[in-house]
Amino acid sequence: MFGWKDAYSVNVNEIDEQHKELFRIAGKIYDLVHTDADYDHFDEVMSILQKLKEYTLYHFQHEEKLMEKYGYRETDSHKIEHLFLIKKLQKFEKDDIDMERKDSIIELITFVSDWISGHILKTDMKYKDFFNKNGLY
C-alpha cells in the first residue's frame, strides 16, 4: 500500500524523493497501528501525523513554486487539488483518533496513500514532460 513504485516517478529527482518521503511517513503510521496491540501508540501516531501534515505542506509549496517559476499552465488547478488534501489532513485532529478504533487511523492513512498515488499518476504526470523540457530532472 505504501511502497514506492517506479510508475510514480515524474523524472524530477527532488520531487520523486519528496513523494517517497510522503509514502514513508504514512507507512510509519500504518505500521504503528498494526504492531504491538497491547501498547498505546497514540502519542507516536499523533507525532507522525503532525510530521505528515508538515511534510505534505512543505512538498506542495515546493512543487507549486517550481510550477510558478517555470510557468506551468495548470498551476491553479493543481493548487486546488493540493488544498483538498491539506484541508482533509487539518480536519483530522486529536479528537478524531481513538486508538481503540484503529480503523479510523487506517481509513485516514489509506485515504492519504490512495490520494497521493492517484494524484501523482493523474495530475503530477502532466508536468513531467513540461519540467523535463525546461531542464528540470
Sequence positions of predicted segments:
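Small-residue-biased structural context
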Residues: M1-Y137
